[in-house]
UniProtKB/Swiss-Prot annotation:
Belongs to the SpoVG family. Pfam families: SpoVG. This is Putative septation protein SpoVG. InterPro entries: SpoVG, SpoVG_sf. It comes from Caldicellulosiruptor saccharolyticus (strain ATCC 43494 / DSM 8903 / Tp8T 6331). Could be involved in septation. Keywords: Cell cycle, Cell division, Septation. One of its GO terms (biological process) is sporulation resulting in formation of a cellular spore. SUPFAM superfamilies: SpoVG-like.
Length: 88
């Protein structure tokens, strides 16, 4: 499975959340509402989630292994940095 498109849908400079993105896989499956967060060790992605009645956040969709998570995160952050650089 490959990342075939990354669309930056919203960019913000407020708080730790920097952008919301949609990622398409193999030109046939899309995951919306992936967040780019600025953490203590740099940018990372947070998968779409919902709040349970108990107040916990549970991922709606997420990679099941580290290799896939790394691939998605790399593609998303590279696209975000390219968009930010182009806007400066």
């Amino acid at each position: 499975m490959q990342v075939t498109d990354v669309r930056i849908r919203k960019i913000t400079n407020e708080g730790r959340m920097k952008a919301i993105v949609s990622v398409t896989f193999d030109n046939c499956f899309v995951v919306h509402d992936i967040k780019i967060i600025e953490g203590q060790n740099g940018l990372f992605i947070a998968m779409p989630s919902r709040k349970t009645p108990e107040g916990e956040f549970k991922d709606i969709a997420h990679p099941i292994n580290q290799e896939m998570r790394d691939m998605v995160q790399k593609a998303v952050i590279e696209k975000y940095e390219a968009v930010i650089s182009a806007g400066e």
